[in-house]
Amino acid sequence: MSQEYTEDKEVTLTKLSSGRRLLEALLILIVLFAVWLMAALLSFNPSDPSWSQTAWHEPIHNLGGMPGAWLADTLFFIFGVMAYTIPVIIVGGCWFAWRHQSSDEYIDYFAVSLRIIGVLALILTSCGLAAINADDIWYFASGGVIGSLLSTTLQPLLHSSGGTIALLCVWAAGLTLFTGWSWVTIAEKLGGWILNILTFASNRTRRDDTWVDEDEYEDDEEYEDENHGKQHESRRARILRGALARRKRLAEKFINPMGRQTDAALFSGKRMDDDEEITYTARGVAADPDDVLFSGNRATQPEYDEYDPLLNSAPITEPVAVAAAATTATQSWAAPVEPVTQTPPVASVDVPPSQPTVAWQPVPGPQTGEPVIAPAPEGYPQQSQYAQPAVQYNEPLQQPVQPQQPYYAPAAEQPAQQPYYAPAPEQPVAGNAWQAEEQQSTFAPQSTYQTEQTYQQPAAQEPLYQQPQPVEQQPVVEPEPVVEETKPARPPLYYFEEVEEKRAREREQLAAWYQPIPEPVKEPEPIKSSLKAPSVAAVPPVEAAAAVSPLASGVKKATLATGAAATVAAPVFSLANSGGPRPQVKEGIGPQLPRPKRIRVPTRRELASYGIKLPSQRAAEEKAREAQRNQYDSGDQYNDDEIDAMQQDELARQFAQTQQQRYGEQYQHDVPVNAEDADAAAEAELARQFAQTQQQRYSGEQPAGANPFSLDDFEFSPMKALLDDGPHEPLFTPIVEPVQQPQQPVAPQQQYQQPQQPVAPQQQYQQPQQQVAPQPQYQQPQQPVAPQQQYQQPQQPVAPQPQYQQPQQPVAPQPQYQQPQQPVAPQPQDTLLHPLLMRNGDSRPLHKPTTPLPSLDLLTPPPSEVEPVDTFALEQMARLVEARLADFRIKADVVNYSPGPVITRFELNLAPGVKAARISNLSRDLARSLSTVAVRVVEVIPGKPYVGLELPNKKRQTVYLREVLDNAKFRDNPSPLTVVLGKDIAGEPVVADLAKMPHLLVAGTTGSGKSVGVNAMILSMLYKAQPEDVRFIMIDPKMLELSVYEGIPHLLTEVVTDMKDAANALRWCVNEMERRYKLMSALGVRNLAGYNEKIAEADRMMRPIPDPYWKPGDSMDAQHPVLKKEPYIVVLVDEFADLMMTVGKKVEELIARLAQKARAAGIHLVLATQRPSVDVITGLIKANIPTRIAFTVSSKIDSRTILDQAGAESLLGMGDMLYSGPNSTLPVRVHGAFVRDQEVHAVVQDWKARGRPQYVDGITSDSESEGGAGGFDGAEELDPLFDQAVQFVTEKRKASISGVQRQFRIGYNRAARIIEQMEAQGIVSEQGHNGNREVLAPPPFD
């Protein structure tokens, strides 16, 4: 390659003029501003403060800070996605100004005007194209304001496709005007680039690295003698040279002639600064230069053919491997993975003092850590005398003698006359003799001598092939020493180094991948004459290159020449097998993959021990079963289905045993005895019913001698009337006593047959029935496997526990029924109930939490990503509101808006003289004109002179209970009656204190979220208070909403579902209120909090306060009882209207008394109804319950009933509510927190695991009357007007509530109560189908 002429030039600094200084400084500042602007555009966040963002409460995310956020928002608003190109245009303009700063040409104003027109056309058309075809970015239009105007103008005229075409044409014209480029020139340039790319790709595809000649990027005159190389050029090399010349001539048509040598160096796979072309592996073995896969070099050596072993079949005697070992010591190449040791001294012919240089030198390959196996050329004849076992080089480290390194004797120019050298004792092959030559040959050009290799056979291998024989050594003419020139080092080309390093790593991976794994050979056998070259897997890795070279013609002579030396060093390698297991590998093409390990097949005995029955054992097992069966009942036979069922039953029993060993019996003693009796009776009835269904299902075929199945044998159920006779899927808790012999093939038959023979099992179970209570009958039938069989076993109502004791005695199962009576704790929790059925008061033990209150992890977390507020859409909606109000001749300006999770409030500044009532009357018309579901008008906003207009959001967000509970307002509130309602329109949580309400009235239609709101309040108190602080009385007529809380320790009594019990519970609350008032008056306190403080103070003084109102006959206590801390009581009624309509007007008086006086006693009411009518929510109740919550109602009348004002009829439902707090006349709009059923069940289960409820007796029982509070009883006082009303009714002979109401001028409720008292006394009849009553009493006597 010709050397480029360079001249040393001295760099001088020239001073710039003042104008240029200012220009370059200004350009640098503009470029920095463009970089800052690009960072601001890329890091834009809609929540940052900007021109379109009015309120923000978060840290700034933009990298450019607040100015960057403002500027990015403005650019996106104007240009859309084209704003990203503005920094690029700024940098390009700076570059253009810097390049043309020295030009002093005059200014062509016409050209400037054309460029300005072109710039404007490009900007406008680009924005328009983006607006028509691209998606919007964030909440901006894709083309910005400019693109939106163009698109809205062109689409009605030309449609989207026509507008796109028109804008493209204008864009093309603008590009020409701005740049001055002709589109013909642009097309030619694009075509030239495409052709260059295709030419480059096609040449690169056809190119082969191994055929690139070194002369393409090396100067022949400087580095090599061209005439001398052509003298030794072979026919093959000449053919290849001609092909390369033709390819270069073709490439000259498309590639710059000045860059040919650079391209050749780039694609040749060779570094420009390589010193030598010999490729060595990490273990010192030369890589075959003709191996395209591993060497990565040329496959041709066109300079030399006289000594080419491929063309001349000359013996390979060149010591390349020894030279490689020396080179690894001198150069910084990778060390060999396996140890390569020196050859021990052996008496032989001396090594020649000087060796010829390596003639065949490939390009240096990668420094691999594994030896490279070079495949032998195809033209070489294979020698049958040479073969190599694999075991001899497998483990040289385990031998006491240091392994012998294979030695390659050097060869001279005449291989036929060269003697084969062996290492001498006084001069071992160390590598020092070769290092000097290698260092010289590293920088030398390719020599004229051909490398030849001679394989030196190790001493330990010789007895395997043939006996050592003396071989005559032929004289060899010594070659003339070659004067070598040191090749000058060239400067590194770093890009080529990177390419070469990458290829070197790839070749290392390939070499390591295809490295063979030797397999051990147990017994050496002599190699037959018909054996060909050894396999790849049998070649030792140390001599990888030389192991393939026996195909050369001189290998046989070299092997025979080393016979004597090999005999001396025979014990170097041995056939000792390694101690550890050798990996089994599979030979073939590709990586050596280990074969799978051998798997030991278990015997029949082992399979039988695991319960696996082989088909061959079936006959023997059936015979054994029949033999045992004949001992007890002759004639009983079983079919295959029954045998399989019994085997499944046995497996189920074993599984139950393992489950008991895993979980133990730690919770069997926690159940009270009375609960055990009730649960055991219920489970026995379920077992009987399930046995009936199973018998009907499988009663097709019975064994001979079996008695017919009778349900009378299993009649035992005190709760039979309460259970359904339908089939039930049982749920077994797998807890079984550990059995001693789990696998017995005969016993399951007895166990399976028992349910079908009710007579015999009754006789067998007579003795266990007297010893064991009925509770333990579910002690062991818990088998989750094969439910059809295992459920038939517990059909016995009396202790079927021995059914699982049978398999323990395979020979004499009769005594099994005498042994199972072991004192075992009862397990009433093991039931036959379906897992999907809810069971109230379930005693199944749970893991007791360690925290005093439930964790928030039980609730559903809110989503981490919050959708940003679309301020642009809000601005558009504000303008639309103003326009719609103007249509109704109302002038108003939207001064502010408050976006919330569900609705957005727009604050209207009305013009002077405009009344707010006008907007309230237009609420429905505004909803219609704004295309919204509902519009609520807030006439007065506290603290502001504006009118609020609440519109629903397009995308409604869900308010999660967890995010409301995880708030400082809720956590910091010390009251145990703190409840959360949801979020207001500003997104702030709304927290209320039930102790300050003090009672709550909730109303809403079905589906409005009323029950969800009640659940949210209950969960709030469960997350705030312990059972000793707050207790609940829940009344749920629908038996759906509040029944899920059954079993929590906060309950005073079970969830009340009967209306009679509900009235009794309210009466108990009134009596409890009176009792607490007496105690508080005795202690001189005014509320329950003061009472509890007195009790706590007495406890700290260690002087408890005795009950001042206790009498010896009041209770069975032997000592005087003391006062204890009283919890708050919350009475929750889910359907108040149903309670009022079912029980009667008596409940109204009880609720009124509680609402009036119960606040100080710590009793609070939460009444929920879906019918807020005046006959349900009376004036007396409303007067005493000031705090109200209104969900969506059906009409303004209902809204006025619950809130005393309209507005609830325009709510959105699904938790949207109006909350009227205590001492407040203006309701607050709140979006209720959403509670899932899974969350409720999770919290309930968490509290159930903490403890059991301590119910108070007598809450739901009525001691005064058996009929409850449904009507008049003897103890109730008659109305003062009762006698006068009776006289009026008997005289008029017409009984009606309205007549009594008009006659005595009393309220409707009082008149109705008087009529009911008359009905109870028998004066009037019951109300007929038409609503009339008959007067039964005779008329008064005159």
UniProtKB/Swiss-Prot annotation:
It is a multi-pass membrane protein. Residues 1-24, 99-115, 180-1342 are cytoplasmic. The chain crosses the membrane at residues 25-44, 75-98, 116-132, 163-179. Keywords: ATP-binding, Cell cycle, Cell division, Cell inner membrane, Cell membrane, Chromosome partition, DNA-binding, Membrane, Nucleotide-binding, Transmembrane, Transmembrane helix. InterPro entries: FtsK/SpoIIIE/SftA (IPR050206), FtsK_4TM (IPR025199), FtsK_alpha (IPR041027), FtsK_dom (IPR002543), Ftsk_gamma (IPR018541), P-loop_NTPase (IPR027417), WH-like_DNA-bd_sf (IPR036388), WH_DNA-bd_sf (IPR036390). Residues 45-74, 133-162 are periplasmic. Residues 437-448, 690-699 have a biased composition (Polar residues). It is found in: Cell inner membrane. Residues 987-1200 form the FtsK domain. The keyword rRNA processing does not apply. GO terms for biological process: cell division; chromosome segregation. Residues 346-386, 409-489, 604-639, 688-712, 741-862 are annotated as: Disordered. Belongs to the FtsK/SpoIIIE/SftA family. Consists of an N-terminal domain, which is sufficient for the localization to the septal ring and is required for cell division, followed by a linker domain, and a C-terminal domain, which forms the translocation motor involved in chromosome segregation. The C-terminal domain can be further subdivided into alpha, beta and gamma subdomains. The alpha and beta subdomains multimerise to produce a hexameric ring, contain the nucleotide binding motif and form the DNA pump. This is DNA translocase FtsK. The gene is ftsK.
